Amino acid sequence: MRKNILTKIIGFLAIVAILAGCKAKKELLPASAIPKVMELMPPSPDLTQKIKLDSVNGMNTVFKTLSIKAKADLNINNNSNDVNMNIRIRNNEAIWVSVTAMAGLEIARALITADSVKVLNRMDNIYLKKPFNYIYEFTNERITFQTLQSVLLGNAMSEFISESTQLKNEGQNTQLKTVLASMVYNFTVNQQNKVLFTQLNDAAAGQELLVNYTNFLSINQQLIPHSVIMNSKAKNKAISLDLNYLKIDMDGNVDLPFRVPERFLIKN
């Protein structure tokens, strides 16, 4: 069981920008399976482009709350750990994560809002409380709370889509690309305009996030990926997180319990 496991998971989601147990190695997504990012010619912002971009944004999952039960394989520099995760989201408000070992013992808990990142490390009895900009130690400063939600759900990142977004048809799929100063946002959508692949790349900072989405199932008449595989590189660390969503409940009441025991050491 590794110490500080949730701090590493939060760092990983931060690289996104956040998201130990019995060890079980899993095969990571081979490089050949990751769609290649193609050089795109800048198209004219015509009606066809606008219709496509509106359609992509229109297929984003719309919800008030989500409750997700997941199995996860976290691999940091080839050290693999299997854990269970409960993820609860209040749209544009809070992301709550509970991490348990396979024996059912909770080892960590986190509460992320647009203003703060809070972590209970039950392995070491430590409470970490940081402002949201703590994640910028790991990722580009353009990353927002909404970006984190999009990564977990496979939504297109609407905050990075504009008339400057370039489009290119690739078979039945469409590749889209937006350049934002040093950060490049690439993603691929299928015929239903659901995101299959996301890449956030900041070459100047040496940071990259790749996410693949598969196994789309209908929840409340909306297609949501149930397999999410993330691979990131930042600060000389290679991290992967393989999430398998076992159950998703939408728009129910969700509690976000977060009580700090008196015995915990507080780190700000």
For every predicted segment, state its role.
Residues K23-N79, K267-N268:
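N-terminal leader/targeting segments and the immediate start of mature chains
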Residues A24-L28, T165-N268:
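Gly/Pro-enriched, hydrophobic low-complexity segments
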Residues K69, S80-R88, E93, I107:
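Beta-strand-dominated lipid-handling architectures at cellular/organellar boundaries
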Residues I18-G21:
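C-terminal motif of bacterial Sec signal peptides marking the signal peptidase cleavage site
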Residues R2-I10:
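Bacterial N-terminal signal peptides that target proteins for export
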Residues I126-L128, N133-Q175, V179-S182, N186-N190, ...:
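A sequence/structural signal for flexible, mid-protein segments enriched
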Residues A94-F145:
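An acidic-aromatic
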